[in-house]
From Swiss-Prot:
The family this protein is said to belong to: Belongs to the disease resistance NB-LRR family. RPP8/HRT subfamily.
Native source organism of the sequence: Arabidopsis thaliana
Name this protein carries in UniProt: Disease resistance protein RPP8
Effect on the protein of changing V283R: In strain: cv. Di-17
InterPro entries: Apaf_helical, LRR_dom_sf, LRR_R13L4/SHOC2-like, NB-ARC, P-loop_NTPase, RX-like_CC, Rx_N, WH-like_DNA-bd_sf
Gene: RPP8
Result after altering A700G: In strain: cv. Di-17
Length: 908
């Protein structure tokens, strides 16, 4: 494994030497010596990796080599960047720069000679230890080849989670009965060891038709080991009242009071997933009233937690799979599309498969991991290698003993070991994040790009390929929400995260700092070896000034409840080799981002999302290698953005502040590599800057009075790759009617469109992009019913009308309209009184949300014809609505076929 990481580092170093050969002239002799030693080193790596398991000495050799490769890359890249920066004009500046250049060249030559000598010494030690040269004639797949293979694999992998459901049908039925038919038990607990399928079982119960009909509202909160009282209460309230914008501003007392009153008055189901200790319940129990009506489904590895929460708790013990069920689940993963008519699996492979699943201890997680491991192996010899590996390195046993846990861990580890090097690197990056984190896939893709895992292709595409492969192998769980208005996230199962942490420690990949006063880190024994930091405590920022952190390449601060403050202006002085810096939600003393940020010339990734920053320094112009820059800071006053972004020509992702001061003028025309641009303002930039951004796939733009829709539209004509276009709300756009200027039919790739601009009438359907899938209309002020036009957009799958998008009183969805629509949301349309849905309209509709439309008299009668409808959310409507639509109500016939009907805040 270490050999793979060293080889990966060497490959990047060779690429750097080749790419910058012209700028490295003058130190050719030193570079030739370095290259000779690197070739010798490369030939020793295979044998070294084969012998590392039996020798600490060999492991140390490999760690030394990895450090040397990193050091060489840092030295060479620093030299190139310093040579590129500060092209001064005038004789004096030229002379001064020439002197600095000669000094730098002398220093880099000396440094390279030092690295070469150290490599030579390590090679000598390795050879004296008996490590042999192995010339590897193979080659790794190129990025394009890997993507092609992944596309082929992906075609044969199931899109549905139904493959997980083996042996749980009776358990689901039993649990549903206890929740909807039995009033004796306030709390129902699912208990069992990690990986046994508690969460999968709870999720099936949570979404069951009978459960959805029985309760008025639902909340699902993952508690996990690290949580705060306030965070759990916020999450429950957000689930029960998703459109309440005041929740995040409430203190603990206000949260407790509101939740208590809500649960006391209604019939709600609350799922607390992954509660570890009895004491955890004591921290959060104050919001749950004694009055019955609400119920709780709780999952825990500790049976005592449920009984501690409620002495009358019904404890359901999740059971392991028997051998037949284990093999059935494994088959579903390995052969997702096979049916009974197809040729049977080779008898020898089937026999090996059934033997291998016995080592999984009946745990679904381990079975799925094994299935993912076998899914891309199609021959008897390939299966035999996996079979031998499992059989020789683990010992089977009963599912309760330590041998079985070791067996399960080994199964999960094998899935990791089977990954190609680039995916190992991707996987270990997930160790940065705390347990149960929802990890933004967008951020993750750019982390990977900043690490140099891929380049040359669109970053989002490459990231999607790699993430899908990790999901396919059951190493990562993806949020498969087809509503693209919502952020995409991925997560890790607890046990898989333990594997990730263990491997990260083994490879000295990462140091996690939880408390600077103790050694609770992944790599406490040798912190100087780790070049990545993840800070999980606001108290730990002071360690960034330590000299042993000077080689750190990545610093990520995941979001926690506590505040993170950076108070020192010199905080970045010792971090000059950083490639990744994520300071989202961090607060800066005086609101100033330190000028020392300009010294981080190696940065590829910088996020200040929701950071408390009111001043950005002009020294940011030095960050010429940035691929990702997020400046959506948390500031009440408009912020000044210096006109230095134009020099960051490598940028692929740029998110600008929503409030910029009048003095901000940004020249962005040279950012031709951008794929994602949020917050582009025609007040602060010229619309012609967009003409050259032909790689853009996502654009969110704010219009000003001096730029009309027609002008903008003509500037966007060259953006043929644009997939998402959002027009952001501003007071200026609300004062102008853009109806006559709307023309977007030339955007043939556009899938998502958001319009927060005033239009008295919806444009004709021929003016919309021809393949539009998702449409969001807000603050449009339309006076005519938009439905006759929208229902003719044949590819639409989701429509959302919000906050006075429509000012009329009557809407009609006619027969045959919206042939592919799956989701519709009508929110805060204060003038809407009547909505008619004709039979034959919206035949594919699955989810309908009506929120705070106070004048709407009743639910459309035509909903009774939409048999595809699975979920109906009624929120913020009058009590009469709920009384009419519950069983026995006069309008119940309209919704009796809908499995999941939710009433949220409908008690007024």
């Amino acid at each position: 494994m270490a050999e793979a990481f060293v080889s990966f580092g060497l490959e990047k170093l060779w690429d750097l030497l080749s790419r910058e050969s012209e700028r490295l002239q003058g130190i050719d002799g030193q570079l030739d010596g370095l290259k000779r030693q690197l070739r010798s080193l490369q030939s020793l790596l295979k044998d070294a990796d084969a012998k590392k398991h039996g020798s600490d000495r060999v492991r140390n050799f490999l760690e030394d080599v990895k450090d040397l490769v990193f050091d060489a890359e840092d030295i060479i890249e620093s030299y190139v960047l310093n040579k590129l920066s500060g092209k001064g004009k005038g004789v004096k500046k030229h002379v001064r720069r020439l002197a600095c250049f000669l000094t730098d060249r002398h220093k880099v030559a000396s440094d390279i000679e030092g690295i070469t000598k150290r490599i030579s010494e390590v090679i000598g030690e390795m050879q004296s230890f008996g490590i042999q040269q192995i010339i590897d004639g193979g080659r790794s797949l190129s990025l394009q080849e890997r993507q092609r293979v992944q596309r082929e694999i992906r075609q044969t992998y199931p899109d549905s989670s139904e493959s997980d459901l083996v042996g749980v049908e009776q358990s689901v039925k039993e649990l549903v009965g206890h929740l909807v038919e039995n009033d004796v038990h306030q709390v129902v607990s699912i208990a069992g060891m990690g990986g046994i399928g508690k969460t999968t079982l709870a999720r099936q119960v949570f979404h069951h038709d009978l459960v959805r009909r029985h309760f008025d509202g639902f909340a699902w909160v993952c508690v996990s080991q690290q949580f705060t009282q306030k965070h759990v209460w916020q999450r429950i309230l957000q689930e029960l009242q998703p459109h309440d914008g005041d929740i995040l501003q409430m203190d603990e007392y206000a949260l407790q009071r509101k939740l208590f009153q809500l649960l006391e008055a209604g019939r709600y189901l609350v799922v607390l997933d992954d509660v570890w200790k009895k004491e955890d319940w004591d921290v959060i129990k104050a919001v749950f009233p004694r009055k019955r009506g609400w119920k709780m489904l709780l999952t825990s590895r500790n049976e005592g937690v449920g009984i501690h929460a409620d002495p009358t708790c019904l404890t359901f013990r999740a059971s392991i799979l028997n051998p037949e069920e284990s093999w059935k689940l494994c088959e579903r993963i390995v052969f997702p599309r096979r049916d009974e008519t197809e040729v049977r699996l080779d008898e020898e492979m089937e026999a090996m498969g059934k033997e291998m699943v016995t080592h999984c201890g009946g745990l679904p997680l381990a079975v799925k991991a094994l299935g993912g491991l076998l899914a891309n192996k199609h021959t008897v010899p390939e299966w035999k290698r996996v079979f031998d590996n499992i059989g020789s390195q683990i010992v089977g046993g009963s599912w309760l003993d330590d041998n079985s846990l070791n067996s399960v861990y080994r199964i999960l580890s094998l899935s990791y070991e089977d990954l190609p090097t680039h995916l190992k690197h991707c996987f270990l990056n997930l160790a940065h994040f705390p347990e149960d984190s929802e990890i933004s896939t967008y951020s993750l893709f750019y982390y990977w790009a900043a690490e140099g895992i891929y380049d040359g292709s669109t970053i989002e595409d490459s990231g999607e390929y790699y993430l899908e492969e990790l999901v396919r192998r059951n190493l990562v769980i993806a949020d498969d929400n087809y509503l693209s208005w919502q952020s995409k996230y991925c997560q890790m199962h607890d046990m898989m995260r333990e594997v990730c942490l263990s491997k990260a420690k083994e490879e000295n990949f990462l140091q996690i700092i939880i408390d600077p006063t103790c050694t609770s880190t992944i790599n406490a024994q040798s912190p100087s070896r780790s070049r990545r930091l993840s800070i999980h405590s606001g108290k730990a920022f002071h360690i960034l000034g330590h000299k042993n952190k000077t080689k750190v390449r990545s610093l990520i601060v995941p979001r926690f409840e506590e505040d993170y403050w950076i108070r020192s202006a010199s905080v970045f002085h010792n971090l000059t080799l950083l490639r990744v810096l994520d300071l989202s939600w961090v607060k800066f003393e005086g609101g100033k981002l330190p000028c020392s940020i300009g010294g981080l010339i190696h940065l590829r990734y910088l996020s200040l999302y929701e950071a408390k920053v009111s001043h950005l320094p002009s020294t940011m112009r030095n960050l010429k290698l940035l691929l990702y820059l997020n400046l959506r800071v948390d500031t009440e006053e408009p912020i000044h953005v210096p006109n230095v972004l134009k020099e960051m020509i490598q940028l692929r992702y740029l998110s600008l502040p929503l409030k910029m001061d009048d003095k901000t003028k940004l020249e962005l025309g040279d950012l031709v590599n951008l794929e994602y641009l949020y917050g582009f303002s025609t007040q602060h930039s010229s619309v012609t800057d967009l003409l050259r951004m032909t790689k853009l796939r996502y654009l969110a733009v704010s219009l000003s009075e001096r730029c009309n829709f027609e002008t903008l539209s003509s500037s966007l004509r060259e953006l043929r790759n644009l997939e998402t276009l959002n027009f952001l709300f501003s007071l200026e756009t609300y004062m102008v009617d853009y109806m006559g200027e709307f023309v977007l039919d030339h955007f043939i790739h556009l899938k998502q469109l958001g319009l927060a601009v005033r239009m008295s009438k919806i444009p004709d359907q021929h003016q919309f992009p021809p393949h539009l899938v998702h449409l969001f209309l807000i603050y449009c002020g339309m006076e005519e019913d938009p439905m006759p036009i929208l229902e003719k957009l044949l590819h639409l799958k989701s429509v959302r009308l919000a906050r006075k998008a429509f000012l009329g009183s009557r809407m009609v969805c006619s027969k045959g309209g919206f042939p592919q629509l799956c989701v519709i949301e009508i929110s805060k349309e204060s003038e809407l009184e009547e909505w008619i849905v004709e039979e034959g309209s919206m035949p594919c509709l699955r989810t309908l949300t009506i929120d705070d439309c106070k004048k709407l008299k009743e639910l459309p009668d035509g909903l009774k014809y939409i048999t595809s409808l699975k979920e109906l959310k009624i929120e913020g409507m009058k009590r009469e609505w709920k009384e009419k639509l519950v069983p026995g109500g006069e309008d119940y016939y309209k919704v009796q076929h809908i499995p999941d009907v939710q009433f949220i805040n409908c008690d007024q």
